[in-house]
Amino acid sequence: MNKLENPLSHDVAGPAPRHKTTQVMVGDVAVGGGAPIVVQSMTNTDTADVAGTVEQVAALTRAGSELVRITVDREEAAAAVPHIRDALRKRGITTPLIGDFHYIGHKLLADYPACAEALDKYRINPGNVGFKNKRDSQFADIVEIAIKNNKAVRIGANWGSLDQELLTKLMDENAVSAKPRDVRAVTREAMVQSALLSAARAEEIGLAKNKMVLSAKVSAVQDLIAVYQDLASRSDYAIHLGLTEAGMGSKGIVASSAALGILLQQGIGDTIRISLTPEPGGDRSLEVQVAQELLQTMGFRTFVPLVAACPGCGRTTSTTFQELARSIQDFIRVEMPAWKTRYPGVENLNVAVMGCIVNGPGESKHANIGISLPGTGETPAAPVFVDGQKFRTLRGANISGEFKALVIDYIEQRYGAGVAAPVTVTAAE
């Protein structure tokens, strides 16, 4: 074989076939079993604050979150859950709610049956559901309540709260092994076993496989990839992907995207959450936007029109193309909730905003509608392309406003009738 030949190359670009998993219904949202990969998020409000939690769930839903997890950590939070659900429904929001339980989940669900009924899924952490002789009984209590209420369960192992008895057992076995493994490898094995043993126990109690989702989260990218590859190879439970404690800003976005992107490309993952630490006063909805953009840029789903824009260089000393790209992108995000109903299919739109003649015309032709703004020293004219054909040339001080109007016209023509239709291209000016 030629050294430059890629043995994995293929004629059709795309991810590996999806890992076959058992479908789980969380409320009315299908997870796994070939269903579209689901975006979920988590609030950071005090769940006992009904009004504040309702506002944040509503904001996350508007951003596109299809499942929302809320902390249920004490009696006041458990008592608030049905009121949160009811307030959301009064607003017409039916996004399934997931209760996040640690330490005393068995007690809260038993003492507050309205909470158990209002939630659509319970998250159990096998590392802290109970300790020593209480672990099995407290785990069983939650599973039995889930069965009684016909609810789904996520068994979510996390290496920050890993079952220490299991980890110690595996470490001791490894210490006397003829071929001892690296400590991190043993820890990964403990993560996978924690999830799988708990799932097997839940099935013994009577919880059906189509009621269970598994996760095994770590904060190191390479370890996360290895853990989920192992978990997927050893089971067909629906899988929730997430890099725990990903961090703030670009670091969190890059780390999560790197880890989840590789796993998704390998066909692993049925629902994802991007666990970003928000900036002080920052928008919690950013994690939803990043999750959507990851899935869309990889070709798994379409949520909003894509805006392609060049990075800029010495040929583009003008900031016009940057301002226009930002303006178009922000405009699309704001309008999408209304557009989803008014313009079915608009999420498939591609817009290009380019800054000079080098790649501008070519990239614009690849988009549904694109503009190539003049670079430094170039003729002060901006050709607009529609579906690969030159449509018009914009000049003057209001190029940005005119192009935005053309984008709106394109959307109305192509998607306004409820069915995607060709756009009439008049002679280029």
UniProtKB/Swiss-Prot annotation:
Pathway participation: Isoprenoid biosynthesis; isopentenyl diphosphate biosynthesis via DXP pathway; isopentenyl diphosphate from 1-deoxy-D-xylulose 5-phosphate: step 5/6
Cofactor stoichiometry and binding remark: Binds 1 [4Fe-4S] cluster.
Reaction(s) the record says it catalyses: (2E)-4-hydroxy-3-methylbut-2-enyl diphosphate + oxidized [flavodoxin] + H2O + 2 H(+) = 2-C-methyl-D-erythritol 2,4-cyclic diphosphate + reduced [flavodoxin]
Top-level taxon in the UniProt lineage: Bacteria
Binding site for [4Fe-4S] cluster: 310, 313, 356, 363
One GO term (biological process): terpenoid biosynthetic process
Sequence similarity: Belongs to the IspG family.
Name of the protein described by the UniProt record: 4-hydroxy-3-methylbut-2-en-1-yl diphosphate synthase (flavodoxin)
Gene behind the chain: ispG
